[in-house]
């Protein structure tokens, strides 16, 4: 079984933990709204006003004038992330970090020591809460794809288990947009086909999916059937240092893109300094989901 652990509003939650007077208030971590900054993280209070990550800070302030803006302390968040990762490694060496605030864990070999996967997931969630005073949402499922969806369903402070014999019952009522690789354009095609749920997608003939999406159609069919054979890949000796983010909405203005490029560059630079390294080559990778 696979666990996906995802820290809830990580940057903002760390700030609220360290400054109890911020509890219950709308918190935004990111750039100065007077200097073309961008929202790096928003707590759940401010999200109720429509604020989300990757949004220009000036726009966020218009949506929630009472929001409290805090500068990002990326080095410190990395230290807290290391503490979280140490908790993961108590239960399994098979930990695949995705970013500072989320990771996949393969706990298939941990049952004799720590009990069933659901128990391991709850122990991890409890340890993070008790030792670090932070909240994680946890999904437990037969594979990475399902575990990721499970951890997202009941945020914040969620815990969802998907049993192997209940995969289709879990997936079928969900909207097709829950599938990896279904972006705005793909969603429009499904709407024209009358497909709204994963169940409806699963019932489409594979030939129809391939005719509209090519080889991507077969990938979507497998996900709709709950199939994901990717293993959890633990940390290896790094040959490169990178940082990436996924935007909740498309970015199409140069100022926001420039601000985020600077943000990601600063995060990579901090990690280089932590490990006393320097880079020789710089690469920029852009991915679009259609």
Outline where the language-model segments fall.
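Short acidic, glycine/serine/threonine-rich loops at helix termini
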Residues: 14-16, 39-42, 146-154, 192, ...
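Short Gly/Ser/Thr- and Asp/Glu-enriched loop/turn motifs at secondary-structure junctions
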Residues: 98-102, 141-144, 236, 277-281
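DNA-contacting surface of Y-family translesion DNA polymerases
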Residues: 178, 186-286
């Amino acid at each position: 079984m696979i666990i996906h652990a995802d820290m809830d509003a990580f940057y903002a939650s760390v700030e609220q933990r360290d400054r109890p007077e911020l509890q219950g208030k709308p918190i935004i971590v990111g750039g100065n709204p007077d200097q073309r900054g961008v929202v790096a993280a928003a707590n759940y209070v401010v999200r109720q006003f429509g604020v989300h990550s990757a949004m220009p800070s000036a726009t966020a302030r218009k949506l929630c004038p009472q929001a409290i803006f805090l500068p990002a302390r990326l080095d410190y968040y990395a230290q807290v992330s290391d503490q979280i990762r140490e908790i993961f490694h108590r239960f399994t060496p098979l930990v695949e970090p995705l970013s500072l605030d989320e990771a996949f864990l393969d706990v298939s070999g941990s049952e004799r020591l720590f009990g069933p996967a659901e128990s391991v997931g709850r122990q991890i969630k409890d340890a993070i809460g008790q030792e670090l005073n932070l909240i994680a949402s946890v999904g437990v499922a037969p594979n990475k794809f399902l575990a990721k969806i499970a951890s997202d369903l009941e945020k914040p402070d969620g815990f969802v288990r998907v049993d192997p014999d209940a995969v289709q019952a879990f997936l079928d009522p969900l909207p097709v947009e829950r599938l990896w690789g279904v972006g705005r354009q793909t969603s429009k095609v499904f709407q024209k086909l009358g497909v709204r749920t994963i169940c409806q997608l699963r019932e489409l003939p594979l030939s129809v999916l391939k005719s509209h999406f090519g080889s991507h159609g077969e990938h979507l069919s497998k996900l709709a059937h709950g199939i994901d054979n990717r293993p959890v890949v633990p940390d290896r000796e790094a040959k490169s240092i990178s940082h990436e983010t996924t935007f909740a909405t498309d970015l199409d203005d140069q100022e926001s893109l420039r601000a985020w490029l600077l943000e990601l560059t600063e995060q990579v630079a901090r990690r280089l300094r932590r490990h006393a390294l320097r880079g020789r080559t710089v690469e920029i990778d852009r991915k679009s989901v259609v």
